[in-house]
Amino acid sequence: KGTKGTFALTGATIETVTRGTIQNGTVIISDGKITAVGANVAVPQGATVIDCKGKFIYPGMIDGGSILGLSEVGSDPRTQDYNEVGDVVPQMKALTAVNPNAVAIPVTRISGVTTTLVVPQGGLFPGTASLINLHGYTPDQMYAGFDAVVMNFPTTGRRGFWDRRSDDDIKKAVEKSLGKINEVWEKTIQYHKLDSANKGKVTYY
């Protein structure tokens, strides 16, 4: 876990998002937040100074999709919590299954990744993905304020020379998959109409 206080990272080459590259720059961090960045930044009294000469500082990287915090040991199903039962379960939120104490989280953070989108796996609509910061004691503390329903678009095309299905069989598989998606959309529209007519008081089943 992080350490509180005021820190000054000095003498570094700083790669910024909007201000280009700063040579021999300083970054001030106070109570977990960056408060100053520049080449002529005064070091606050009492700050812990860390000499970063010859090193690079850059914004934390964002992983656009992973099961970090949802999976621990691949051979132990008790540590796997990224695949819920059911093919259409958009109400299942990945955030509720995130383990803040997962060993891979600090390892990933120290490698420069500070944020990741945790994505549920599985069926057509396997759940809702959540953006998390890789620092916090609870899932709510880690939550970065973004959710999105995940849809795994069906893949029914020929997968290689070993796929011996006829063209007609592949066409039928495509139509079946698209029909399933259309069924979900139709049910969603009907639910929305009922929910709107009842002013948001319809119970979800």
For the regions a protein language model found, what residue spans apply to each?
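Metal-associated gating/positioning segment near the N- to mid-region
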Residues: K55-S111, T116-V119
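Polyanionic/metal-chelating signatures
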Residues: A104, R109-Y205
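Structural motif
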Residues: T6-F7, T48, G60, T114-L117, ...
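N-terminal helix-cap/turn-to-beta initiation motif at the start of protein domains
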Residues: K1-F7, V43-P44
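Histidine-rich, glycine-flanked metal-binding segment
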Residues: I14, T18-Y58
